[in-house]
Amino acid sequence: MTHYEGDLRPTTARFVIIASRWNARITDALVTGARQSLAGNGIGEDAIDVVRVPGAWEIPMAANRVAQGGQHAAIIALGCVIRGDTRHYEHVADLCAEGLMSVQLQTGVPVLNGVLAVERVEDAEARAGGSHGNKGEECALAALELVNLMELLP
């Protein structure tokens, strides 16, 4: 039996962070966390690109274009959708996640979903460097691990 598992060793691969501008205070903290996490694991600033889009709805489109470009080994998608008084929140959060999954399955480029879908702004703050950590950091680590794993898989 062969066992395959990625790790956090530095790679020469390029990474891209695609982040929404909507709820900027939260998404900026997620982007900072992702960049610091990659840098802390040996990925140079010149190997990290950041793409900003208006909102979470636009993230899958940008991810698809980037994945098809073939220059990045992994995509880190970051955003924040906070429930409001209408069902719009559900449509945006669900279809964003579905779109990101579709991009990675169709292109073979790992797409890490760090788009927060939360009830309240306090929930987002807790996940953007607060009591629940930083989901940007977590997605960056998962991206690095997946890039290394993809190199190992037959």
UniProtKB/Swiss-Prot annotation:
Pathway: Cofactor biosynthesis; riboflavin biosynthesis; riboflavin from 2-hydroxy-3-oxobutyl phosphate and 5-amino-6-(D-ribitylamino)uracil: step 1/2
Pfam families named in the record: DMRL_synthase
Entry-linked InterPro entries: LS, LS/RS, LS/RS_sf
Domain of life, source organism: Bacteria
EC nos: 2.5.1.78
BP GO annotations: riboflavin biosynthetic process
Sequence positions that bind 5-amino-6-(D-ribitylamino)uracil: W22, A56, W57, E58, C80, V81, I82, N113
Active site positions: H88
Entry keywords, A to Z: Riboflavin biosynthesis, Transferase
GO CC field: cytoplasm; cytosol; riboflavin synthase complex
Reaction equation(s) it catalyzes: (2S)-2-hydroxy-3-oxobutyl phosphate + 5-amino-6-(D-ribitylamino)uracil = 6,7-dimethyl-8-(1-D-ribityl)lumazine + phosphate + 2 H2O + H(+)
NCBIfam families assigned: lumazine-synth
Record function comment: Catalyzes the formation of 6,7-dimethyl-8-ribityllumazine by condensation of 5-amino-6-(D-ribitylamino)uracil with 3,4-dihydroxy-2-butanone 4-phosphate. This is the penultimate step in the biosynthesis of riboflavin.
Family classification: Belongs to the DMRL synthase family.
Subunit record text: Forms an icosahedral capsid composed of 60 subunits, arranged as a dodecamer of pentamers.
Protein name per the record: 6,7-dimethyl-8-ribityllumazine synthase
Organism placement in taxonomy: Bacteria, Pseudomonadati, Pseudomonadota, Gammaproteobacteria, Lysobacterales
